[in-house]
Amino acid sequence: MQAKAILRHTPTSPRKMRLVAGLVRGKRVDQAKAILHNSTKSASRNVMVTLKSAVANWSQLNPDERLNDNELFVKAIFVDEGPSLKRLLPAPMGRAYRIRKRSNHLTIVVDKVENKVTK
């Protein structure tokens, strides 16, 4: 059974958040936490919080199963664009430049690692 966590309206550009999301896609949860802990990107803190929330959601959905972080993996992680705040910056000759302060929505899905037996 898989569990999902969503972080909405994060004030980070989706392009910057996707760089961090690509680092942990498909990794086991313990590996993903180690990667995020050692990352220098500011977006890694938001990904770490959402990953911990997804693991907690999984344990709530499966109260009879006790798994370590190395038995769960990041099944899916994706970043969608959120609403943009539009601001004006004064420019020369009476003009104005538009500044778009972007935001994003982060979704993480975790699932149990299936041990496949080869014959």
UniProtKB/Swiss-Prot annotation:
NCBIfam families: rplV_bact. The keyword Isomerase does not apply. One of its GO terms (biological process) is translation. InterPro entries: Ribosomal_uL22 (IPR001063), Ribosomal_uL22_bac/chlpt-type (IPR005727), Ribosomal_uL22_bac/org-type (IPR047867), Ribosomal_uL22_sf (IPR036394). Belongs to the universal ribosomal protein uL22 family. This is Large ribosomal subunit protein uL22. Keywords: Ribonucleoprotein, Ribosomal protein, RNA-binding, rRNA-binding. It comes from Chlorobaculum tepidum (strain ATCC 49652 / DSM 12025 / NBRC 103806 / TLS) (Chlorobium tepidum). One of its GO terms (cellular component) is cytosolic large ribosomal subunit. Pfam families: Ribosomal_L22. Part of the 50S ribosomal subunit. This protein binds specifically to 23S rRNA; its binding is stimulated by other ribosomal proteins, e.g. L4, L17, and L20. It is important during the early stages of 50S assembly. It makes multiple contacts with different domains of the 23S rRNA in the assembled 50S subunit and ribosome. The globular domain of the protein is located near the polypeptide exit tunnel on the outside of the subunit, while an extended beta-hairpin is found that lines the wall of the exit tunnel in the center of the 70S ribosome. One of its GO terms (molecular function) is structural constituent of ribosome.
